[in-house]
């Protein structure tokens, strides 16, 4: 099963969008295996966004993600990366399709509400950065048989 890390960034938390965003993700049939409110440290932000180090926007990105509480969510399922990313929408909310999280709630690329893993490999890596194995809970849901074949 694929895993994806989803981060509801400080702007989503401050704007009171946790409920509407989680509702959309859950309605897609995603199985939450970990969820917590967290304050991202500078060290963790550097590890998470390390691939962008040296780019002009890196310092601002670290400053933004550490500026307030975030909601960190781990999800698991078949094709979860593709499902989450299509639900989230394009990185730039101006270009995100209506009906996506960023298309409906986003304002600009600098405050784009949400992070989602972009590959199964990154999903595994990112979930491990933010959650210990003890924090991940896997269980069967009665609805699973109606969601996947």
Curated annotation (Swiss-Prot):
Its cofactor is Mg(2+). Its main location: cytoplasm. The active site is at residue 115. It catalyses: a 2'-deoxyribonucleoside 5'-diphosphate + ATP = a 2'-deoxyribonucleoside 5'-triphosphate + ADP; a ribonucleoside 5'-diphosphate + ATP = a ribonucleoside 5'-triphosphate + ADP. GO terms for cellular component: cytoplasm. Its EC number is 2.7.4.6. It is an enzyme of class 2 (transferase). The keyword RNA-binding does not apply. Major role in the synthesis of nucleoside triphosphates other than ATP. The ATP gamma phosphate is transferred to the NDP beta phosphate via a ping-pong mechanism, using a phosphorylated active-site intermediate. ATP binds at residues 9, 57, 85, 91, 102, 112. The lineage of its organism: Bacteria, Bacillati, Chloroflexota, Chloroflexia, Herpetosiphonales. InterPro entries: NDK-like_dom, NDK-like_dom_sf, Nucleoside_diP_kinase, Nucleoside_diP_kinase_AS. GO terms for biological process: CTP biosynthetic process; GTP biosynthetic process; UTP biosynthetic process. Belongs to the NDK family. This is Nucleoside diphosphate kinase.
């Amino acid at each position: 099963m694929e895993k994806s890390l989803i981060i509801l960034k400080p702007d989503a938390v401050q704007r009171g969008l946790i409920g509407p965003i989680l509702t959309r993700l859950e309605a897609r049939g995603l199985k939450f295996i970990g969820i917590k409110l967290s304050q991202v440290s500078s060290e963790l932000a550097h590890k998470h966004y390390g691939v962008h180090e040296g780019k002009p926007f890196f310092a601002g990105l670290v400053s933004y993600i550490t500026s307030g509480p975030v909601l960190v969510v781990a999800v698991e399922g078949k094709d979860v990366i593709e499902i989450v990313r299509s639900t989230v929408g394009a990185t730039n909310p101006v270009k995100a399709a209506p009906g996506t999280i960023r298309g409906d709630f986003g304002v600009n690329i600098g405050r784009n509400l949400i992070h989602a893993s972009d590959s199964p490999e990154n999903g595994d890596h990112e979930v491990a950065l933010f959650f210990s194995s003890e924090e991940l809970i896997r269980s069967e849901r009665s609805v699973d048989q109606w969601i996947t074949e």
